[in-house]
Amino acid sequence: MVAARTASLSSQKIISEAKPNLTDLRSFIEKVRQEFPEDVLTISKEVDPRFEITALVAKLEQERRFPILIFENVKGTKFPVVTNVHASRRRLAAAIGSEPRSAVASYLKRIEHLIAPQEVATGPVKEVILKGDQVDLRAIPQIVHHQDDAGPYLTAAVTLARDPVSGRLNCSFNRLMSIDRNHTSIHLTLAKHLWEFYTNAEKLKQPLEVAVILGAHPAWSLGALNIGSIDEEEFYLMGALAGEAMEVVPAETMDLKVPARAEIILEGEILPFERVDEGPFGEFTGYSLGSRKREVFHVKAISHRKDALLHDIAVGHLDHLLLSTIPMEANLFRAVKAMVPSVKAVRIPAPFTVYVSIEKKTEGQGKNAILAVLGADLYMKHVIVVDHDIDIFNDQRVQWAVGTRCQADRDVVIISNVGGSDLDPSDLKDGVTAKMGIDATAKPRLDSFTPRHRVPKDVLDNLDLKDFIPASWLAQKDRKS
């Protein structure tokens, strides 16, 4: 597979040897605890997995606090739960050795230097192995996140599968709804890679073997969300993002390699021609989507650490919303750069929405950037492009640019009946949507647009607030911010 991988990604360097590591979820949490001690909170009081875990996340969000939460005592199970791991851009950036503002650049730089996985004989995830009648998913924490959810869900499930036609590997996030001791539903996003693998398997009248990873280093999460060619095998991306080779071990029941230092692995198959009612479920959009027919996952084996943690994602909260931003922004930055080389930054501020900052050299580049975004990611349906003098991390400044540099009849692009997300509650039918782009750049260019009013730079630079305002007032203002 390494040779095939090299051929399909000739522009990227593959490192086949790397130093053995301890790159796992626990080591990441410990790293966060050491560097940002306020970012890890352990709760020893018993918590009910039905609503209380999400309620605690929501209560802390109301206080503008987003720590990793470790629940040591979860009602009805021996397994602790960890959630809110991704609820900080600072933590996600730290997972790839970066600062928050440079996370996209660091992501793109790292995935240019791929690191092959390192196969080992065994690992912590093999400490307990359950097969056949020993399998009981009900022993795992049964977390119900929102009041309208149809039942318990596994929301941090990273699915690993091999295409039965091409032999290519893929990792992706797929939610699982508990059905019984050895079955769940599985949500396959329309037209994505795992959906295509499963479609190929159904055409062959066979199940699709998959392994589901529950609890691994955030590099697995970020790599699983990478948007790339179907020829890419994300194992190499995981190592690149972590900066170390990922240790893998053979699965118990299939010809797949799984992360040796995961917390829990589910092995099984997505059954052909079988569907089950799934949902309602509260999604990342903030809405509870209704019941739909979904595929069925039959679990044949579970392996886990003796003291395994169940990784949960607080659906629809910051933990969920931030996770996809860095890989999606990186993909969009790369796509826009191919069309507009002077792109400066990309930001996803809300579901289905993206801001793009460019240094416009010629008229028309604003709309070129819009088309590049809409063609690069099915999920994106609203694009706002601004000049490089606008801070796209400041929503107010972006809206100021829309209000002062845009004319709707000239600068708004609307495309009807195109492929989008089947999780969008506003679409008319599964995955079909309308998309809009707003070119909020100055016309024809920033340097020839109506000048902005400014306080002279030398006056701003030389003025010190402490010379005019009491220190006690300044300190009070700092405490409130």
Model-derived regions, located:
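Extended, highly charged
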Residues: 2-296, 300-480
